[in-house]
Protein backbone atom coordinates (compact mmCIF):
# COMPACT_ATOMS: atom_id res chain seq x y z
CA UNK A 1 0.00 0.00 0.00
CA UNK A 2 2.44 2.65 -1.15
CA UNK A 3 0.83 5.96 -0.15
CA UNK A 4 1.74 9.53 -1.12
CA UNK A 5 2.55 11.44 2.05
CA UNK A 6 0.77 14.75 2.58
CA UNK A 7 2.31 15.85 5.85
CA UNK A 8 3.41 13.20 8.29
CA UNK A 9 2.25 10.53 6.43
CA UNK A 10 -1.70 -12.80 23.99
CA UNK A 11 -1.30 -15.54 24.58
CA UNK A 12 -2.25 -17.02 27.99
CA UNK A 13 -1.18 -20.54 27.16
CA UNK A 14 -4.09 -20.37 24.75
CA UNK A 15 -4.99 -20.86 21.13
CA UNK A 16 -8.44 -19.28 21.41
CA UNK A 17 -7.58 -15.66 20.66
CA UNK A 18 -10.08 -13.02 19.65
CA UNK A 19 -7.44 -11.77 17.23
CA UNK A 20 -3.94 -12.70 16.14
CA UNK A 21 -1.52 -11.00 18.54
CA UNK A 22 1.81 -10.52 16.78
CA UNK A 23 4.25 -8.64 18.99
CA UNK A 24 6.78 -7.78 16.27
CA UNK A 25 6.00 -4.07 16.07
CA UNK A 26 6.12 -3.51 19.85
CA UNK A 27 9.19 -5.74 20.07
CA UNK A 28 11.07 -3.67 17.48
CA UNK A 29 10.12 -0.42 19.20
CA UNK A 30 11.41 -1.82 22.50
CA UNK A 31 14.64 -2.95 20.81
CA UNK A 32 15.13 0.52 19.34
CA UNK A 33 14.75 2.10 22.77
CA UNK A 34 17.57 -0.04 24.18
CA UNK A 35 19.76 -0.10 21.07
CA UNK A 36 20.09 3.38 19.53
CA UNK A 37 21.97 2.00 16.50
CA UNK A 38 19.12 -0.29 15.50
CA UNK A 39 17.09 2.52 13.92
CA UNK A 40 20.00 3.37 11.63
CA UNK A 41 20.54 -0.29 10.72
CA UNK A 42 16.87 -0.74 9.80
CA UNK A 43 16.95 2.50 7.80
CA UNK A 44 19.99 1.25 5.88
CA UNK A 45 18.13 -1.95 5.00
CA UNK A 46 15.19 0.11 3.75
CA UNK A 47 17.53 2.16 1.58
CA UNK A 48 18.96 -1.07 0.17
CA UNK A 49 15.48 -2.39 -0.66
CA UNK A 50 14.52 0.85 -2.40
CA UNK A 51 17.73 0.76 -4.42
CA UNK A 52 17.00 -2.80 -5.57
CA UNK A 53 13.45 -1.81 -6.49
CA UNK A 54 14.75 1.08 -8.58
CA UNK A 55 17.33 -1.14 -10.28
CA UNK A 56 14.62 -3.68 -11.14
CA UNK A 57 12.50 -0.95 -12.71
CA UNK A 58 15.40 0.39 -14.73
CA UNK A 59 16.58 -3.00 -15.98
CA UNK A 60 13.32 -4.89 -16.05
CA UNK A 61 15.10 -7.65 -14.13
CA UNK A 62 14.92 -9.22 -10.72
CA UNK A 63 15.28 -12.56 -8.99
CA UNK A 64 12.04 -14.02 -10.25
CA UNK A 65 12.83 -16.85 -12.66
CA UNK A 66 11.99 -20.46 -11.87
CA UNK A 67 15.73 -21.21 -11.81
CA UNK A 68 16.16 -18.90 -8.86
CA UNK A 69 14.48 -20.81 -6.05
CA UNK A 70 16.00 -19.59 -2.81
CA UNK A 71 16.48 -22.31 -0.18
CA UNK A 72 16.77 -21.18 3.44
CA UNK A 73 18.31 -23.56 6.05
CA UNK A 74 16.16 -23.70 9.18
CA UNK A 75 16.88 -24.72 12.76
CA UNK A 76 14.00 -25.08 15.22
CA UNK A 77 14.83 -24.66 18.92
CA UNK A 78 12.10 -26.34 21.02
CA UNK A 79 12.12 -25.16 24.65
CA UNK A 80 9.92 -27.17 27.01
CA UNK A 81 9.25 -27.19 30.75
CA UNK A 82 6.82 -30.13 30.69
CA UNK A 83 6.40 -33.26 28.58
CA UNK A 84 3.30 -31.88 26.85
CA UNK A 85 5.41 -29.08 25.32
CA UNK A 86 7.81 -31.45 23.54
CA UNK A 87 7.06 -31.10 19.84
CA UNK A 88 7.73 -34.31 17.88
CA UNK A 89 9.57 -34.40 14.56
CA UNK A 90 6.46 -34.87 12.43
CA UNK A 91 4.88 -31.72 13.83
CA UNK A 92 8.05 -29.70 13.16
CA UNK A 93 8.10 -31.04 9.61
CA UNK A 94 4.43 -30.16 9.18
CA UNK A 95 5.28 -26.55 9.96
CA UNK A 96 8.06 -26.45 7.38
CA UNK A 97 5.69 -27.98 4.83
CA UNK A 98 3.10 -25.30 5.62
CA UNK A 99 5.72 -22.59 5.12
CA UNK A 100 6.66 -23.98 1.74
CA UNK A 101 3.07 -24.38 0.58
CA UNK A 102 2.26 -20.78 1.34
CA UNK A 103 5.50 -19.24 0.07
CA UNK A 104 5.28 -21.28 -3.17
CA UNK A 105 1.52 -20.66 -3.52
CA UNK A 106 0.86 -24.37 -3.45
CA UNK A 107 -1.73 -23.87 -0.72
CA UNK A 108 -5.03 -25.59 -1.52
CA UNK A 109 -7.00 -22.51 -0.46
CA UNK A 110 -5.36 -20.28 -3.08
CA UNK A 111 -8.68 -20.76 -4.92
CA UNK A 112 -10.24 -18.55 -2.23
CA UNK A 113 -8.23 -15.50 -3.32
CA UNK A 114 -10.79 -12.96 -4.59
CA UNK A 115 -10.83 -12.47 -8.34
CA UNK A 116 -9.73 -8.84 -7.98
CA UNK A 117 -6.48 -9.95 -6.29
CA UNK A 118 -5.62 -13.11 -8.24
CA UNK A 119 -3.33 -11.30 -10.69
CA UNK A 120 -1.35 -9.94 -7.73
CA UNK A 121 -0.92 -13.26 -5.89
CA UNK A 122 2.66 -14.52 -6.01
CA UNK A 123 4.75 -17.65 -5.84
CA UNK A 124 7.53 -16.11 -3.73
CA UNK A 125 9.97 -18.81 -4.87
CA UNK A 126 11.52 -19.18 -1.43
CA UNK A 127 11.69 -22.60 0.22
CA UNK A 128 12.60 -23.56 3.76
CA UNK A 129 14.57 -26.71 4.58
CA UNK A 130 15.51 -28.17 7.95
CA UNK A 131 19.29 -28.01 8.27
CA UNK A 132 21.35 -31.14 7.59
CA UNK A 133 24.60 -29.77 9.08
CA UNK A 134 25.04 -27.71 12.23
CA UNK A 135 27.49 -24.77 12.44
CA UNK A 136 30.33 -27.18 13.32
CA UNK A 137 29.64 -29.41 10.33
CA UNK A 138 28.03 -32.21 12.31
CA UNK A 139 24.93 -34.08 11.16
CA UNK A 140 21.61 -32.68 12.37
CA UNK A 141 17.92 -32.94 11.61
CA UNK A 142 17.53 -29.20 12.16
CA UNK A 143 15.71 -29.66 15.47
CA UNK A 144 17.12 -28.81 18.91
CA UNK A 145 15.12 -29.73 22.00
CA UNK A 146 16.03 -28.38 25.41
CA UNK A 147 14.37 -28.73 28.79
CA UNK A 148 14.09 -25.49 30.73
CA UNK A 149 12.82 -24.36 34.09
CA UNK A 150 11.14 -21.35 32.48
CA UNK A 151 7.37 -21.95 32.40
CA UNK A 152 6.39 -18.86 30.39
CA UNK A 153 8.43 -16.76 27.96
CA UNK A 154 7.93 -13.09 27.16
CA UNK A 155 8.92 -11.09 24.09
CA UNK A 156 12.17 -10.07 25.79
CA UNK A 157 14.48 -12.49 23.91
CA UNK A 158 15.50 -14.53 26.94
CA UNK A 159 14.43 -17.62 25.01
CA UNK A 160 17.33 -16.92 22.61
CA UNK A 161 20.09 -17.29 25.21
CA UNK A 162 21.26 -20.41 27.05
CA UNK A 163 22.46 -18.22 29.91
CA UNK A 164 18.85 -17.15 30.52
CA UNK A 165 17.22 -20.57 30.25
CA UNK A 166 16.76 -20.54 26.47
CA UNK A 167 18.97 -21.76 23.64
CA UNK A 168 21.64 -19.82 21.76
CA UNK A 169 21.07 -19.00 18.10
CA UNK A 170 22.93 -20.87 15.41
CA UNK A 171 24.90 -18.53 13.14
CA UNK A 172 22.13 -16.31 11.76
CA UNK A 173 24.19 -15.58 8.66
CA UNK A 174 23.67 -19.24 7.73
CA UNK A 175 20.37 -20.30 9.33
CA UNK A 176 16.87 -19.08 10.03
CA UNK A 177 16.47 -19.62 13.77
CA UNK A 178 12.97 -20.41 15.01
CA UNK A 179 12.46 -20.65 18.78
CA UNK A 180 9.33 -22.42 20.02
CA UNK A 181 8.22 -22.10 23.62
CA UNK A 182 5.27 -21.35 25.87
CA UNK A 183 4.81 -17.62 25.21
CA UNK A 184 2.86 -15.39 27.55
CA UNK A 185 0.34 -12.87 26.16
CA UNK A 186 1.37 -13.14 22.47
CA UNK A 187 1.56 -15.91 19.88
CA UNK A 188 4.69 -14.82 18.08
CA UNK A 189 7.20 -12.13 17.17
CA UNK A 190 10.17 -11.73 14.87
CA UNK A 191 13.33 -9.76 14.42
CA UNK A 192 13.61 -7.66 11.27
CA UNK A 193 16.51 -7.32 8.83
CA UNK A 194 19.22 -5.14 10.34
CA UNK A 195 18.88 -6.36 13.91
CA UNK A 196 21.55 -7.97 16.13
CA UNK A 197 22.79 -11.31 14.77
CA UNK A 198 22.47 -13.13 18.10
CA UNK A 199 18.76 -12.23 18.29
CA UNK A 200 17.92 -12.81 14.64
CA UNK A 201 14.96 -15.11 14.03
CA UNK A 202 11.40 -15.65 15.18
CA UNK A 203 9.72 -16.83 18.36
CA UNK A 204 6.47 -18.80 18.25
CA UNK A 205 4.27 -20.08 21.04
CA UNK A 206 4.09 -23.86 21.28
CA UNK A 207 0.36 -24.29 20.72
CA UNK A 208 0.26 -22.66 17.26
CA UNK A 209 3.38 -24.30 15.83
CA UNK A 210 2.81 -26.86 13.11
CA UNK A 211 -0.40 -28.42 11.83
CA UNK A 212 -0.56 -31.75 13.71
CA UNK A 213 -2.56 -31.83 16.97
CA UNK A 214 -3.00 -28.06 16.79
CA UNK A 215 -6.47 -26.69 17.52
CA UNK A 216 -8.17 -23.32 17.43
CA UNK A 217 -8.14 -20.81 14.58
CA UNK A 218 -4.33 -20.71 14.22
CA UNK A 219 -3.96 -24.36 13.23
CA UNK A 220 -2.52 -24.16 9.70
CA UNK A 221 0.97 -22.97 10.58
CA UNK A 222 0.36 -19.44 9.36
CA UNK A 223 1.58 -17.72 12.49
CA UNK A 224 5.04 -18.81 11.36
CA UNK A 225 4.28 -17.72 7.77
CA UNK A 226 3.30 -14.28 9.10
CA UNK A 227 6.42 -13.95 11.27
CA UNK A 228 8.75 -15.13 8.49
CA UNK A 229 7.21 -12.34 6.44
CA UNK A 230 8.46 -9.90 9.08
CA UNK A 231 11.86 -11.63 9.14
CA UNK A 232 12.04 -10.98 5.40
CA UNK A 233 11.19 -7.31 5.73
CA UNK A 234 7.40 -7.18 5.40
CA UNK A 235 5.27 -4.90 7.53
CA UNK A 236 1.69 -5.51 8.57
CA UNK A 237 -0.76 -4.95 5.74
CA UNK A 238 -2.15 -1.78 7.38
CA UNK A 239 1.31 -0.29 7.92
CA UNK A 240 0.95 -0.38 11.73
CA UNK A 241 -1.06 2.83 11.90
CA UNK A 242 -4.43 3.96 10.57
CA UNK A 243 -4.36 3.92 6.76
CA UNK A 244 -0.59 3.43 7.02
CA UNK A 245 2.05 2.48 4.47
CA UNK A 246 3.41 -1.07 4.35
CA UNK A 247 6.01 0.03 1.75
CA UNK A 248 4.58 -2.31 -0.89
CA UNK A 249 3.12 -0.89 -4.10
CA UNK A 250 0.41 -3.43 -4.88
CA UNK A 251 -1.31 -3.92 -1.51
CA UNK A 252 -4.34 -1.63 -1.03
CA UNK A 253 -4.14 0.93 1.74
CA UNK A 254 -6.05 -0.41 4.75
CA UNK A 255 -7.35 1.17 7.93
CA UNK A 256 -6.34 -1.41 10.52
CA UNK A 257 -5.86 -5.11 11.20
CA UNK A 258 -8.73 -7.49 10.44
CA UNK A 259 -9.83 -9.83 13.24
CA UNK A 260 -11.69 -13.09 12.80
CA UNK A 261 -12.60 -14.50 9.41
CA UNK A 262 -14.61 -12.10 7.23
CA UNK A 263 -16.59 -13.53 4.33
CA UNK A 264 -17.74 -10.32 2.67
CA UNK A 265 -16.15 -7.35 0.90
CA UNK A 266 -14.60 -4.81 3.27
CA UNK A 267 -13.35 -1.35 2.41
CA UNK A 268 -11.45 1.34 4.29
CA UNK A 269 -9.27 4.39 3.62
CA UNK A 270 -11.04 5.06 0.29
CA UNK A 271 -9.46 1.97 -1.25
CA UNK A 272 -12.34 1.71 -3.70
CA UNK A 273 -13.24 -1.40 -5.67
CA UNK A 274 -10.15 -3.29 -4.47
CA UNK A 275 -11.18 -3.07 -0.84
CA UNK A 276 -9.17 -4.48 2.05
CA UNK A 277 -6.79 -7.36 1.33
CA UNK A 278 -7.61 -9.06 4.61
CA UNK A 279 -6.69 -12.48 3.20
CA UNK A 280 -3.02 -11.42 3.00
CA UNK A 281 -0.65 -13.33 5.27
CA UNK A 282 0.42 -10.04 6.87
CA UNK A 283 -3.04 -9.27 8.27
CA UNK A 284 -4.45 -10.67 11.53
CA UNK A 285 -7.22 -12.92 10.20
CA UNK A 286 -7.60 -16.57 11.23
CA UNK A 287 -5.37 -19.08 9.45
CA UNK A 288 -8.27 -20.41 7.36
CA UNK A 289 -8.87 -16.93 5.92
CA UNK A 290 -5.28 -16.21 4.77
CA UNK A 291 -4.11 -17.28 1.32
CA UNK A 292 -1.66 -14.94 -0.42
CA UNK A 293 1.44 -12.81 -0.65
CA UNK A 294 1.53 -10.27 -3.50
CA UNK A 295 4.07 -9.75 -6.26
CA UNK A 296 5.16 -6.56 -4.49
CA UNK A 297 5.72 -8.40 -1.23
CA UNK A 298 7.62 -11.07 -3.13
CA UNK A 299 9.94 -8.48 -4.67
CA UNK A 300 10.54 -6.88 -1.27
CA UNK A 301 11.39 -10.19 0.41
CA UNK A 302 13.61 -11.49 -2.38
CA UNK A 303 15.51 -8.20 -2.65
CA UNK A 304 17.13 -8.99 0.71
CA UNK A 305 19.06 -11.83 -0.96
CA UNK A 306 20.80 -9.63 -3.54
CA UNK A 307 24.54 -9.06 -3.11
CA UNK A 308 25.09 -6.86 -0.08
CA UNK A 309 21.61 -7.57 1.29
CA UNK A 310 20.97 -8.61 4.90
CA UNK A 311 19.90 -12.15 3.90
CA UNK A 312 22.40 -12.69 1.04
CA UNK A 313 24.75 -14.82 3.17
CA UNK A 314 22.06 -17.50 3.45
CA UNK A 315 22.62 -18.29 -0.23
CA UNK A 316 26.11 -19.53 0.69
CA UNK A 317 25.18 -21.36 3.88
CA UNK A 318 26.64 -24.82 4.48
CA UNK A 319 23.60 -25.69 6.56
CA UNK A 320 22.12 -27.84 3.77
CA UNK A 321 25.42 -29.54 2.89
CA UNK A 322 26.47 -33.04 3.83
CA UNK A 323 28.12 -33.07 7.30
CA UNK A 324 31.88 -32.52 7.08
CA UNK A 325 33.02 -33.36 10.63
CA UNK A 326 32.46 -36.20 13.07
CA UNK A 327 28.96 -37.30 13.92
CA UNK A 328 27.20 -35.29 16.58
CA UNK A 329 26.66 -37.14 19.86
CA UNK A 330 23.31 -38.88 20.15
CA UNK A 331 21.08 -37.03 22.60
CA UNK A 332 18.26 -38.90 24.31
CA UNK A 333 15.04 -36.97 23.76
CA UNK A 334 12.26 -37.83 26.19
CA UNK A 335 9.10 -38.85 24.36
CA UNK A 336 6.00 -37.22 25.82
CA UNK A 337 3.70 -39.79 27.37
CA UNK A 338 0.69 -37.49 27.14
CA UNK A 339 -0.38 -34.45 25.17
CA UNK A 340 -3.47 -32.48 26.19
CA UNK A 341 -5.25 -30.10 23.82
CA UNK A 342 -6.83 -27.64 23.23
CA UNK A 343 -5.76 -25.61 26.21
CA UNK A 344 -7.65 -23.51 27.31
CA UNK A 345 -10.91 -25.26 26.38
CA UNK A 346 -14.63 -24.74 26.85
CA UNK A 347 -16.46 -28.02 26.28
CA UNK A 348 -13.95 -30.85 25.93
CA UNK A 349 -10.26 -31.71 25.91
CA UNK A 350 -8.41 -34.49 24.12
CA UNK A 351 -5.74 -36.55 25.85
CA UNK A 352 -3.23 -38.13 23.44
CA UNK A 353 -1.58 -41.15 25.10
CA UNK A 354 0.33 -44.34 24.37
CA UNK A 355 -1.18 -47.83 24.76
CA UNK A 356 0.08 -48.25 28.33
CA UNK A 357 -2.60 -45.85 29.56
CA UNK A 358 -5.65 -47.67 28.19
CA UNK A 359 -7.69 -49.04 31.11
CA UNK A 360 -6.18 -46.62 33.63
CA UNK A 361 -8.03 -43.94 35.55
CA UNK A 362 -7.46 -40.24 35.05
CA UNK A 363 -8.55 -37.68 37.61
CA UNK A 364 -9.36 -34.02 37.19
CA UNK A 365 -8.24 -32.09 40.25
CA UNK A 366 -9.22 -28.53 41.12
CA UNK A 367 -6.67 -25.92 42.09
CA UNK A 368 -7.75 -26.53 45.70
CA UNK A 369 -6.71 -30.19 45.44
CA UNK A 370 -10.21 -31.69 45.22
CA UNK A 371 -10.94 -34.51 42.76
CA UNK A 372 -13.85 -33.20 40.67
CA UNK A 373 -14.02 -35.95 38.06
CA UNK A 374 -12.66 -39.46 37.41
CA UNK A 375 -12.42 -40.89 33.90
CA UNK A 376 -11.54 -44.38 32.70
CA UNK A 377 -9.16 -44.18 29.75
CA UNK A 378 -10.52 -46.31 26.91
CA UNK A 379 -8.53 -45.04 23.94
CA UNK A 380 -5.16 -43.57 23.00
CA UNK A 381 -7.11 -40.46 21.97
CA UNK A 382 -9.34 -39.91 24.97
CA UNK A 383 -11.94 -37.16 24.64
CA UNK A 384 -12.94 -35.79 28.04
CA UNK A 385 -16.01 -33.60 28.58
CA UNK A 386 -15.35 -30.58 30.79
CA UNK A 387 -18.49 -28.58 30.08
CA UNK A 388 -19.76 -29.25 33.59
CA UNK A 389 -16.70 -27.71 35.25
CA UNK A 390 -16.61 -24.16 36.51
CA UNK A 391 -14.21 -21.78 34.78
CA UNK A 392 -10.73 -21.92 36.25
CA UNK A 393 -7.48 -23.88 36.44
CA UNK A 394 -7.43 -27.67 36.79
CA UNK A 395 -4.95 -30.54 36.72
CA UNK A 396 -5.41 -33.85 34.92
CA UNK A 397 -3.52 -36.63 36.68
CA UNK A 398 -2.96 -40.33 35.91
CA UNK A 399 -0.42 -43.07 36.63
CA UNK A 400 0.79 -46.18 34.76
CA UNK A 401 3.95 -48.22 34.27
CA UNK A 402 5.08 -45.44 31.91
CA UNK A 403 5.14 -42.97 34.77
CA UNK A 404 2.96 -40.23 36.12
CA UNK A 405 1.12 -37.57 34.12
CA UNK A 406 0.08 -34.27 35.62
CA UNK A 407 -1.04 -31.68 33.08
CA UNK A 408 -2.48 -28.26 33.82
CA UNK A 409 -5.38 -26.90 31.77
CA UNK A 410 -7.71 -23.91 31.78
CA UNK A 411 -11.50 -24.25 31.61
CA UNK A 412 -13.02 -21.16 30.01
Which residues are covered by each model-predicted region?
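Residue-level detector of functionally pivotal "anchor" positions at catalytic/ligand-binding pockets or at interdomain
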Residues: 315-341, 355-356, 360
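Bacterial Sec-dependent N-terminal signal peptides
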Residues: 1-27
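Sec-exported extracytoplasmic/periplasmic mature domains
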Residues: 97-108, 230-237, 306, 310
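C-terminal outer-membrane/trafficking sorting elements
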Residues: 336-341, 345-412
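Extracellular low-complexity, Gly/Ser/Thr-rich intrinsically disordered linkers
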Residues: 78, 272-319
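The catalytic-center signature of Zn2+-dependent metalloproteases
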Residues: 216-291
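Propeptide-to-catalytic entry region of secreted or membrane-anchored zinc metalloproteases
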Residues: 19-171
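Active-site-proximal segment of zinc-dependent metalloprotease catalytic domains
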Residues: 155-239
